[in-house]
């Protein structure tokens, strides 16, 4: 948890996510783990938040962290479970999880999540991109040695998954640089 906060750019991710999901009231975070990014919505009383993950230990920890917040729920489940419950969300968030799965699994997760999206809803995907020559040594070290995901993709590769596998159009795509350190 501490490692992720210090080197994973959690603070900047929260700012980016808050910017794009501001005004949405039913939020689903897929792959929420222990709730690092979920804290973005902690002080928004009008938000109904559900975080899901397949890691039961992480979900139990998230439940403890958010025990005083009635508008927060965490479940150990998969997307198919939510679809069978006919749940709908205004905002769906993938925060640094797709680089841990294959292209076909990422496509499947995105396709399933689109079935949970309410009309005029939005899906936000925040993923690390491979380090480039222009990046400093810290970014390269993190990207090449410390990043645990085995499927870090380029922006174009993510766009191809969305457009080719899902047959969807991307309404907006942007690259935001996030700090690797909490004190920057």
Regions flagged by a language model, labelled:
Residues 93:
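A conserved beta-strand element that flanks and buttresses the S-adenosyl-L-methionine
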Residues 125-166, 170-180:
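C-terminal alpha-helical "lid/dimerization" subdomain adjacent to the S-adenosyl-L-methionine
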Residues 97:
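Hydrophobic adenine-recognition pocket in adenosine-nucleotide-binding enzymes
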Residues 34-36, 40-80:
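Class I SAM-dependent methyltransferase SAM/SAH-binding core
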Residues 7-24:
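Conserved alpha-helix/loop element of class I SAM-dependent methyltransferases that forms part
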Residues 25-33:
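Conserved class I S-adenosyl-L-methionine
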Residues 81-86:
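Short conserved loop adjoining the S-adenosyl-L-methionine
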Residues 107-119:
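A short glycine-rich, Lys/Arg-flanked "PGG" loop and its adjoining helix->strand segment in the class I
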């Amino acid at each position: 948890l501490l490692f992720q906060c210090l080197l994973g750019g959690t603070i900047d991710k929260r700012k980016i996510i808050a910017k794009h999901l501001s005004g949405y009231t039913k939020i689903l975070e897929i792959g929420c783990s222990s709730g690092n990014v979920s804290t973005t919505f902690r002080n928004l009383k009008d938000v109904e938040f559900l975080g899901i993950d397949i890691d039961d230990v992480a979900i139990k920890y998230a439940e403890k962290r958010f025990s005083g917040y009635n508008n927060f729920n965490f479940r150990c489940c998969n997307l198919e479970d939510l679809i069978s419950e006919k749940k709908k969300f205004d905002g769906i968030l993938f925060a640094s999880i797709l680089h841990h799965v294959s292209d076909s699994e990422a496509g499947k997760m995105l396709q399933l999540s689109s079935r949970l999206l309410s009309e005029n809803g939005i899906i936000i995907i925040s993923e690390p991109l491979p380090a480039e020559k222009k990046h400093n040594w810290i970014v390269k070290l993190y990207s090449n040695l410390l990043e645990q995901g085995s499927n870090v993709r380029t922006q174009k590769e993510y766009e191809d998954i969305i457009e080719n596998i899902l047959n969807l159009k991307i309404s907006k795509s942007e690259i935001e640089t996030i700090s690797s350190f909490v004190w920057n």
